[in-house]
A protein has these predicted regions:
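Serine/threonine-biased, Pro/acidic-interspersed low-complexity stretches characteristic
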Residues: 4, 21-28
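Solvent-exposed, charged interface segments at domain starts and junctions
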Residues: 4, 15-16, 134
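Protease-labile, long low-complexity intrinsically disordered regions enriched in Pro/Ser/Thr
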Residues: 25-174
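N-terminal Sec-pathway targeting helices
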Residues: 1-12
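Hydrophobic alpha-helical membrane-insertion segments, chiefly the h-region
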Residues: 13-23
């Protein structure tokens, strides 16, 4: 019987939603598919800085700056955020979100759900609606995570954000 552990965290802070998901790869915690959506009340020019305990793997779009720190890694993006969630970089390219994944220290979750392969999509649709994700965010989340959950007969899924909030934080400046 194939089993997997997937920790999926969802944090909603004011008008921001940050999806962080992680799983164990070779017994090493890996943050997978964290996506930051920004929804300001009015268009804003922002510098978004990720302060990470760990090392970045994939980042998109490329940050304007990235450096090693005593803690791990720091990456910053300079974007214009629109109320509809569109992010525009200094070159004028647009993006729906900021994405990164990383190797970082994460504890195993204390609570969650055991999801059967055949229930992956309906489970995610229900939980993401309860968490307040909009259709675009939910579709992005489900199209990434449903195949990974369905790859195993049963998967343990947790939405416990406390598993990663100390290892990764965002700072926003005008």
């Amino acid at each position: 019987m194939k089993k997997a552990l997937i920790v999926i965290g969802v944090v909603v802070v004011a008008a921001l939603a940050c999806f962080v998901a992680c799983n164990m790869v070779n017994n090493e915690p890996v943050a997978k598919k964290p996506v930051l959506y920004l929804y300001p009340q009015e268009e804003r020019h922002l510098t978004v800085t990720l302060d990470l305990e760990g090392s970045l793997d994939t980042v998109y779009p490329a940050p304007d700056s990235q450096q090693a720190t005593e803690r791990g890694t720091q990456a910053s993006w300079m974007v214009t955020a629109a109320p509809d969630g569109t992010l525009t970089d200094r070159a004028g390219r647009t993006y729906p979100s900021l994405f990164w994944d990383a190797y970082m220290p994460l504890p195993e979750p204390d609570s969650g759900f055991v999801v059967a392969r055949e229930d992956a999509v309906s489970f995610l649709e229900g939980k993401l609606a309860q968490l307040g994700l909009n259709d675009r965010e939910a579709a992005d989340f489900i199209t990434y995570w449903a195949p990974r959950i369905r790859a195993h007969e049963y998967t343990f899924v947790s939405f416990d954000a406390s598993a990663y909030t100390q290892a990764a934080s965002y700072h926003f400046t005008d």
